Amino acid sequence: MNAILGLGRYLLLLFLLGFGAKHLQDGAELAGMVPPFFPGGIVWIYFTGVAMILAVISGLAGKWDKLAFTLAGFMVLIFALTIHLRGLMDGGNPRVLFDLLKDIGLTGACWMYASHFARDKSFVG
């Protein structure tokens, strides 16, 4: 059973790799999701895509992985609060609630990874 549960780590890495690649591939299409109070627009889409891919590399290499997944959790929480919660409060698409809950769960997954799977604890004690 522990072998199956250990796969969760790799599923999180796969998820972040896929989302990071999607941000880089479809940056122009996703740029409309950047809140208007964030200057730079599409730059944030590419920045977050690169950040997700770097977190995956960090997790596979075991270097700076605790820091990477702590920061990735904060990044996804910012997505939840500035994009999905704002969309929910605007009364838009009902799917936004599911995106909000997904990102809250993903924040927890990143922080659990940082807490239980990270090998390099040099930056975050």
Could you say what each language-model-derived stretch is?
Residues 1-25, 44-54, 60-125:
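Extended, low-polarity transmembrane helix blocks
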Residues 7, 26-38:
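Short juxtamembrane and helix-loop transition motifs at transmembrane-helix boundaries
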Residues 41:
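Short, aromatic/His-centered strand-loop micro-motif at the edge of beta-sheets
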